[in-house]
Amino acid sequence: MFSQLVVWLLATSTVCLAWDNSWIMDMKYERYSQRRSYYLAEEEDRSVGSDIELTAKEQVVNERLMELKMTELKNGLQDPAGFIPWNHIFDVLYRINSSELFHIIQKMPKGGILHAHDTALCSTDYVISLTYEPNLWQCADPTTGAFQFLFSREAPTNTDTCTWTLVADERAKQGEENYNSALRSQLSMYNTNPIMHNRDVDSIWRQFMGIFGVNGGLLTYAPVWKAYYLQFLKEMFADGVQYLELRTTLPPLYDLDGKTYNEVEIMQIYYDATKEFKKQNPTFIGAKIIYAPVRVVDDAGIPALMAKVRELHEKFPDFMAGFDLVGQEDKGRPLIAFSREILKLPNSIDFYFHAGETNWDGMTDDNLIDAVLLGTKRIGHGYAVLKHPRVLKEVKRNKIAIEVCPASNQVLRLVADYRNHPGSVLLANKEYPVVISSDDPSFWEAKPLSHDFYMAFLGLASSRQDLRLLKQLAINSIKYSAMSPREKLQAMQMWEAEWKKFIDGFNA
């Protein structure tokens, strides 16, 4: 009897212990699940766009948008090499352009472009169309074959390296299709040959800068300069963009009468053209100019450069947004070389410095430190900003927006897979002010802004970030613009009206 009791007690205690252990494990897993949900919710709450609450109509757009996004992501897991952000944009441009996701983003009012350069804007087709203008001459470099263009009533003077012929005659001689194909290859970096994608940074930059040389004489003809700017406003407006802050070197312009136009006169051309376009398009918010000469000026030339900055600011206090320096950072002079004279400029002149457009650490990227110390309002590219925690602290504290240009950073060899772009970290934390821009869309045959928004949404952003992200990025482009508080208020009202049209149209 006693032995039976012992057996019964042992069996009962084993069951109890098993039951107790199961209960404990269930509690531990429940606590783990709760903490995991909390982590995910906290991360989502920290991401850019999380403060936005979508309306019922916006939810309809969001459902379709996320359905398309998740399809791309799931397909990418099954076929990593087919995932669009893994690829070079040149290899998937045709796929992007034909996708419903891209079409929705393109129709979406995206606010403003805050980072774009003067002669790298319009579609290649439009630039080629300009070569049909009368009085246009060309020559080809005997070594590189690179074209030069010049408008003139008479044949320009030949040199050892340049024999001028009329473009019309050359096109007739070669055949229109052959000529235009050769010209296109010099006006665009677009190329589906992987070897061309995988060159080193300096080689890519030489090709990039070479395009500015090819289109220089064509676009700096004063009548064409204005027409080109107006055309970009038209293309930009059609791409769902209502506002522009344009970086320009203000290169000397010329006309057929031998007149050379200086920086003040060129600013006036921009100003008049902007007013003209706004009059014709009432929902266009406007444009401002950032004077951005190339960062190769020697010490002796810096004071004169700063004098020009002051002059332009005095003559166009509302239209000139501020000052920047452009060109390949790795090869150009660093900001510290200009700092002494920059510090002498009046406080009313704002800065929008390119900084950190590099993969180096502790070298070229130190421009980020100088940009912040000099009081920049925004940072152009800021690709290396994650390597500088002190700069990141100032970016947060002083609301210094980072102008992220995804497509440019890939084409110019900073990143291969968009998922590895440092902008992903910025989009994951709403404390970082960030805007998406396009830099030089003409050179990679991209739309003024839609392709960069697309890559940011599908490649840089989390799978969970949705329409709220895109809406916030559009809002940020107004919030961190150079507009005055009053101008920003009016701009927001104009953008909101277009956003409502977009949402209503989708729900119709």
From Swiss-Prot:
Q: Which UniProt keywords apply?
A: Hydrolase, Metal-binding, Secreted, Signal
Required co-factor(s) are: Zn(2+)
Tagged with keyword Metal-binding: yes
Q: What is its EC number?
A: 3.5.4.4
Cellular component, GO, one term: extracellular space
SUPFAM superfamilies named in the record: Metallo-dependent hydrolases
Q: Where is the signal peptide?
A: 1-18
Q: Which GO terms describe its molecular function?
A: adenosine deaminase activity; metal ion binding
The record's principal subcellular location, in a coarse class, is: secreted
Localization, per the record, is: Secreted
Q: Which domain of life is it from?
A: Eukaryota
Give the matching Pfam families. Answer: A_deaminase (PF00962), A_deaminase_N (PF08451)
Entry comment describing in which tissues the protein is expressed: Salivary gland (at protein level).
Q: Which EC class is this protein assigned?
A: hydrolase
Q: Which GO terms describe its biological process?
A: adenosine catabolic process; inosine biosynthetic process
According to UniProt, the reaction catalysed is: adenosine + H2O + H(+) = inosine + NH4(+)
Q: How does activity depend on pH?
A: Optimum pH is 5-8.
Give the family from UniProt: Belongs to the metallo-dependent hydrolases superfamily. Adenosine and AMP deaminases family. ADGF subfamily.
Main function: Catalyzes the deamination of adenosine to inosine.
Q: What is this protein called?
A: Adenosine deaminase
- Originating organism: Lutzomyia longipalpis
**What gene name is given for the protein in this entry?**
ADA
